[in-house]
Amino acid sequence: MYAVAGRLAGIDTNLRAFESYSPARKRWTKLARVPGARGGTGAAFAKGLIISVGGEKPQGTIGSVFGYNLATKRWRRLADLPTPRHGVGVATIAGRVYVIGGGIEPGLSVSSANESLNP
């Protein structure tokens, strides 16, 4: 299990944390930090990558998408979301990542955007 970014309290306390959990050891392990602090990011797994999608920061919503390669233990930038947003639903079907809904402005907002990417 992986935890990607997040926040401690309000939107101005976003994190770059990236951690994995081992149920056998009952322990979290810190991994390479996410490129850029973000709260409300979505995440999925596809093609050997843990993918961090969008998010928000005090200045607005985030459209950037990053993939963490489990083999190389490095982040790389992928194609940005056409519609930057936070709080998205993310799912992988047949290697394609689907990004559903979310908010287009920081705080409580909604979007009907549905987009997909092929990492």
Model region roles, listed by residue range:
Residues 1-119:
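Kelch-like beta-propeller repeat domains
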